[in-house]
UniProtKB/Swiss-Prot annotation:
Residues 658-671 have a biased composition (Low complexity). Coiled coil: none annotated. This is Tyrosine-protein phosphatase 4. Residues 22-135 form the Ig-like C2-type domain. It comes from Caenorhabditis elegans. GO terms for cellular component: membrane. It catalyses: O-phospho-L-tyrosyl-[protein] + H2O = L-tyrosyl-[protein] + phosphate. PROSITE patterns: FN3, IG_LIKE, TYR_PHOSPHATASE_1, TYR_PHOSPHATASE_2, TYR_PHOSPHATASE_PTP. The lineage of its organism: Eukaryota, Metazoa, Ecdysozoa, Nematoda, Chromadorea. SUPFAM superfamilies: (Phosphotyrosine protein) phosphatases II (SSF52799), Fibronectin type III (SSF49265), Immunoglobulin (SSF48726). Residues 586-1159 are cytoplasmic. Glycans are attached at residues 28, 153, 194, 248, 279, 362, 480, 488, 519.
Amino acid sequence: MPRKHFIFLIFLFWKFDSAESISVTSKNATEALLRCPPAENFIRTHMAPDFETPRLVRRLDWFQDDSLVASYQQDILADSSRQWWVSDGRYQLIRPFYTLRVSPVTPEDSGTYRCRLETDPLFSSPQSTATQELAVMVKPVAPSSPEIKTFTNRSITLVWTHNAARAHRPILRFSVSVRTVSDNTRFVMAAPSNATTVIVDNLSPYTLYAFSVRAENSAGSSDFGPETTFRTLGESPNRPPQIQKIRNITSECVEVTITPPDEMNGELDKYLVLIQAVNETIPRKMTFDKPTSTPLTICALSPSTDYALAIEADNGFGTSPQATLVFHTEDSVPNWSPSTITTLPVVGKPEITVLWPAPPLNATEKVIKYHLYYKAKNEDQWKIEHLNVSPNGVKSKLFKYRLVDLNPNTQYRIRVSASTIKGEGAQSADSVAQTDVGEPGTVTFKDLNFDCKNGVKLRWNYEPSVNSKKSPTFTVKVTNQTTSLQFNTTMLSLDIIDLSLYDEYTLRIIVLERSTIDNSTILIGKYSDSHQFILKDKCSYQSSFCSPGEKCAKLTSSAGNPRYISVLIVIFAIIIFAFICFVIVHFARGSMNFKHLLKKKEKCVYLEEISPLVYDSAGQEDIPVELFYGYVEDLNRNDSLKFKTQFQILESQTSGIDSVDSGESNSSSDENSQKNRYNNIGAIEATRIRLNSPTGNDYINANYVDSCNERNAYIATQAPLPSTFSDFWSMIWQERSNIIVCITNMVEDGKRKCDQYWPSQQDSPQTFGNYQVTLVSESTNAHFSHRILDLKIAKAVPAVERKVHQLHFMGWPDHGVPSSVFPLLSFVHYTSDIHSTGPVVVHCSAGVGRSGSYILVDSMRRHLISFRRLNVQGHLTHMRRQRAKLVQTLEQYIFCHEAIRQLIRHGITRVHSDLFMRYLHYLSEENLNGKTRMQLQFEDICDCKHQPRCLIESDVITLPGYHRSDEFMVGSWGNECEDLWRLTWQQKVQTIVILNQRDSFWRKLPSCIYDGEIQLQHGDNFVLLQKDDQQLCVRIVNVSRADLDTDFWREIENVQKQRITYHDAPLLILAHKYPPSVPSPTDSTSTLSLSILFNDDTALAFSICAATTLACQLETTGCVDVVQVLSSYTEIQCGIFASKQEIEIIYEKMSQLVGGTRV
């Protein structure tokens, strides 16, 4: 066992004959020296200076409580060494004054000590004694466990008792240990003086504490005594709970994920929820008792409605402040059907106008489409038409739709249903209507017989309207140069007399029918074709049609009118003149400096024609543009060994930058650290943005970052926190920035990465501090969103507004990289087309990894326009000295090099429509190896590098479009099958395009498939799928190769017009897959005919998808990026484009669309 060192404090109280009292203290407690004053005074008075002679002391004894412990006797023995005696080895008499030394002392040594002195009888005081008290002090024992006297929610009064023995007194002080039981943290506080009570304050509410006491004296401290545990009173939480996520689970229910307040001040007992629709006046109250970590489910909500949600946490002692959120419930299938269907047959046409009222006032669903089902009385299958409506458009009180191409004079049953984005609601009751007979048709002349005098017998044929039950009336007009005769008849023949010989007559017949809807209305048809005849003598005549056996000569029409020929000649001459002017202007523009055009910022250019960048950075290697492609390949060798080495050097050179501050750095203060989204990511002091804040706190987690040739070209910052929204917009206003680049999603992997600092709805401004932000417009495609925001000072007079562009790229994962560089490059080029008025603000979540990658790539892009050398590593080192950890991972560092490499190799592939023909001409030029740039583009992006070559084995491939990442699906089913309709139902496909439909495609499947759950109903151009009470109407569009060859874009436009939901649902293209064959990459055709080029319908389908995507991009942005589409398709399926000709046809079709011809 280790030695225990006791510290003894020794008090000596002397008492001798002269009544003198002396006290002696030994602080180290290793020994006690007890003086004998009578002996000392005697020796000093009567003996020589050496205190040894003459020997006048005859005897001296030391007693402890009357027990002899040490003695000196002068004449007891002849042996002088035996004249000294002690009872214990710890005792020792010290000459010359006979001081008693006790070493070491123990608590048993305490008591009354007495020295007795015997001297020579010649002296006046032959005997003298002195007494003293020796007290040995030890560390005290621990006090008892404290008792609770009074308490509150944040303080407690303790009292205790302490039985101290004589060896323990005096007690100098008591100390109290306060331990938090939950995390075992503790602190010690001293009681005032040596009182046995103390008030412990500054405690946390509703917290279990353990209290114990120790005593302290001059010898030391006791151990802490037994603990007393006690829980303080609770109080209402002082912070609101946090709403982590809200999710629509149905149209009437939401799921809210809540975390309790950070300082609960008690056990969570329940959540109090207040929810109120925006158009309601009284909120609905809900209580969730004993909540757990599982989300709360709130139901009985109205679909497609904005709700205000407030949640309070209750711990039994009170409620917390409210956590508030505004959310929008999901739309639902309408639970109502259109009522009061009115059908109005159209007079004179086999058409019916259908009228129905708007949804009920209590209906909250946003109707996007109405479906009209109709069928004739004798038909079995329903036909369907659709009326698209805008949910955000002008609210109409009455809807109208006209059914056309109906059978005349036929009774129809009509139903109407409404659809939201979630599906179709119930159908209305049948409404019955009868169509009119329709416009009368025309007659066809049968024969004309001459009576050899002055009359003719005319006969004709007429096919009456279907279901027409009334006899028509025929009006026959006979005219010559001087007279006009008109005859009415209900017969199919007419005798005409009193005609002149040798006059040319013209015959025309019109049909009249009475409307079956309105008996007072006469329907007038169109005149028949004109026929001429001339009567002559001897029973002969000329006619435009002759009856057999008659003396009739065929009457031919006269030559064309010279006036019309003159007009045609003039029109032809104008066309020739316009064509010559176009050719002159075209070649005149071609002589302009192409490179000068490419340098215009507002145009999309192809970069390889320009000299790229150099960045002069000491100690780093400058790479010529011509060698950069091979330089990156070299870095990639041996599992990217050189990349790893470079990145390690970069990390070592910038490893200490993240801790840079000067003196008392603002970023290190408690107030500023609360403004950081992540504890380890702050703003470097030297380059941070300093806000002009009236509060005096100028900190925001943002830094200036230079481009290669411009200081403070960018601002890299974190995603703003709700508490820093006002600081963020203050920075935008202060720095006059009008471009915000956001490269993160709101939530990633279930974690909040960014809080929404802009309004969700247009014309619904939100105020952040002193600034008001309004969403002006928002456009979204498959990769990013472009929002235009209106920023102004909220209460400024007069109001000053600024337009701010927010570009939100959504395809970059946190700590990762996109699968392809081309969507990012296209996004960078799109952003660069916007004129900036200040630094470009870039943020992801922390503002270092993805933000740094974007800034690095865009900085290289800017300088590649003017320089032909670049230094990526050197510039990134410079950037990291301005904001720590930019380009955070090795994977991002490699990705930036790959993006710059592809930028150099393929240039700016997002080409403006004005420059597309020149760009196409540029691709057709050959290099020194005899290959065109288009061929190199195909080999680099599309060509399959694997052996054997990759083949498409899946029955269906999902491809991205301009609007969605799953906009197209290409299936290779050669026949109708259950898998086809199962996919259609699961993906909610509403339009199917069949390429080159074969007669054997439709197999007439049974009416029930998919385990009997889905019912099929085939129509003329649609298939109706039904499951329970849900229906899905799928329009079938047939497209042939011949039609595509004749007019490609007319067929594409026709497909787009017939899409039921346009881009809201995938477009499924069915193409027959033929046995695989790999065309030679050098095969070529001068006409690029679709029939010759594509020996497989699936390849044609892929090109249709790509062309449609590019057409949408051209229509929306005025630019085309073919490379981005090719790379995204190849990323999904290697070898999807088998030859250069397949991408050449895409360029060919895009050139037609922008108004050019093939170069």
